[in-house]
Amino acid sequence: MEKTILVGLVNRNQDHKKCQEYLDELEFLSFTAGGTVAQRFTQRIENPNPATLIGKGKMDEISTFVKAMDIQTIIFDDELSPAQEKNISKILKIKVLDRTNLILDIFAQRAKTSYARTQVELAQCQYLLPRLRGMWTHLERQKGGIGMRGPGETEIETDRRIVRDKIALLKSKIKTIDKQMSVQRGNRGKLIRTALVGYTNVGKSTLMNSISKSSVFAEDKLFATLDTTTRKVVIGNLPFLLGDTVG
C-alpha cells in the first residue's frame, strides 16, 4: 500500500464538518486506489495561494511530516491548477494528486471493456494536456522525421501534439464503438429498458445480481463498476432489460 496524506480546505463555502466528510470519502478513494492514509491536514483559508493552494506555514508543516514519515503521495481534495501541481511537487518531491486525478486513476484500474478503457484514456489525456509543461511524461519524444513537424520543434510542443493526436484518435474510436452499440441496441427489439442508478458503492451491482440472478462484479469500494452491464429480467411475466450503471 502506498503511504499517502490528504489535504482539505475550510472556507466560507465549506465548514470544518463538511471538509471532514469530503476527506472521509477521499480516504476511501485512496484506499480503493491502493493507498493508506497516514495523516490528514486541513487549513482555513479564504483566498487560496495561487502558487501552492495552501499557505507557506501549512506547506512547511506538511513538508516536515512527509520527510519524517516517508510519505509517497499527497492528495488534495480541491482541484489543483497545473502550476500548483508543479510547484507543490517541486517543494515536497513526492507524487501530487487532486481528487480528479485520483478518480481517473481508479477508473484506469477498474475499466474492463474496450469502450470503458478508451473513455478513461481520453479523460486522462484531456487532464494531462494542460499539465505537460515542466512534467516528465511517458510520451515518446521525437523531433523531426516522418510525420513530425521538424527538427526545430521543442520537446513540450512535441508532447502536446502527440497528446492532441491521441485525443483525436480516441474520440474517433469512441464514435465507432457508439455506432456498434447503437446497432446492438436495435437488435434487442422493443423490450422495455430500465437502469439502476445511484451514488457509487450504494449496492447497485448487488441488487442487479439479486434481481437478475447473475454475477455482475460487486465490491465494497468506490467506483467498483465502470462498465455498464445489461441483463434480461422477467418479473411477473413482464420481460425487460435491466442495466447496471457506473459506480
Q: Where in this protein do the model-derived segments appear?
A:
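Short alpha-helix plus adjacent loop in nuclease-associated cores
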Residues: 102-120
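Conserved G1/Walker A P-loop phosphate-binding module
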Residues: 1-4, 135-247
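N-terminal accessory targeting/assembly segments
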Residues: 1-105
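A residue-level signal for conserved active-site and pocket-lining positions in enzyme catalytic cores
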Residues: 26, 125, 163
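Conserved phosphate/pyrophosphate-binding and hydrolysis machinery centered on Walker-type P-loop NTPases
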Residues: 16-19, 52-56, 78-79, 111, ...
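A charged, well-structured terminal subsegment
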Residues: 122, 126-139
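Flexible beta-alpha connector loops of hexameric P-loop NTPases
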Residues: 13-17, 49-52, 110-114, 155, ...
